[in-house]
Structure formats: structure tokens, C-alpha cells
């Protein structure tokens, strides 16, 4: 960490800023039971993957199936609620006050994020930039999204800290050469601890000073 240069905090969205993972798990569990009954807990199995990755691995056939699932998913997302993870709003406010640059770096596309903005229009002003799947070529676990976030914010990777909950996201942060703080919201603390500099249950009582301690 270079103490003379700015710090950036890069937040994944689902499972880090908002608690949507249980809702997505229900949706994908239903699809798994219908199309892949041989895979138990299908919703958990595909966590952290983009829609393109899910389609490529599990829904190549029959023709038209991907379009049908996309329509169903868009309809489902219109009914979803985007509840903030405990403590994240206050934590982001504190980081802003301390001069930390903030970005949301998500595997979600622009259409999905538009649904979140309808419920939380303040999201766009809580951070300096939002990197979605529509702005990158490679999905997590490729580090492109986090490297792009750092570039847009003008912060060196050594001064960036990533907040992630999924295995793919944690791997992407590590491959970007950044410190990763894991959120034990989607996976257990034990499951992600080895790949994270620190694991927290949520942002309750988490502070700028604690975050800075991870960077040093």
C-alpha cells in the first residue's frame, strides 16, 4: 500500500451490497429441478457465474431455451427486492468521508441493475462508478472487471481492496493483485477464508480503520 496515494474499495453487488442471493437461489433451483435433476442444489452450484457462463455450461439446448429462461429471469427480477447488507450503507458513507474512491463491480448486466436503481435510486450516488458485465469482455474469475474499476478510479491495484462473497469473485480479486475481504453471506467463512485476507459476516461494526489495516 502506498500511503501517499488514494485508496479504492471495489464492491461486488449481489451478496455484498444487497442480499439477493436467496432469491436467485430459488429461481435457479427451480430451473435445476426441471432441466438438471442430476445436479442437487443447482442454485448454489452456479453461484458467482454470469448468465452467459450458466447458459454455456447447462442450457445449450434445445433452441430457444436460453431466450425463454432470460424472459423468465427478467420477469422474476422485476419482483425482486434489493435489501442492503447490514451496515453497508453506513460503511460506504464513512469511506466517502475519508476520501476513499468507491465502485460497484458486478457480474450483473445493465438491465438487471436498472431494476435495482428503481428501488434504490441513491445507489448511483453512493459510489463513483458501477462496472457491469456489459462493460467487460471476460467474466469473473477473470480479473478484468476489477482492473477496469481500478483504472477508471485512477487507483493503483496495491491500493485497492475488493469485497466479494463468491468463489469466482474472490479469485478475480486475487488475480487482479488486490487484497480481498470476503463476505460470509453466500458461502461459509470456513469455505472462503483461505483465499481472503479477512472474512466478515457483514459490515456491522466494520470501519475504515479496519479496512485500512488489511491494506497495510
Which residues fall in each region the model found?
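Short helix-capping segments at alpha-helix termini
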Residues: 33-38, 64, 97, 121-126, ...
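Active-site neighborhood of HAD-like aspartate-dependent phosphohydrolases
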Residues: 2-44
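Conserved phosphate-coupling serine/threonine residues in phosphotransfer and NTP-handling enzymes
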Residues: 16, 106-108
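Metal-dependent phosphoesterase signature
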Residues: 56-92, 98
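Short phosphate-binding/catalytic loops that engage adenosine nucleotides
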Residues: 98-100, 178
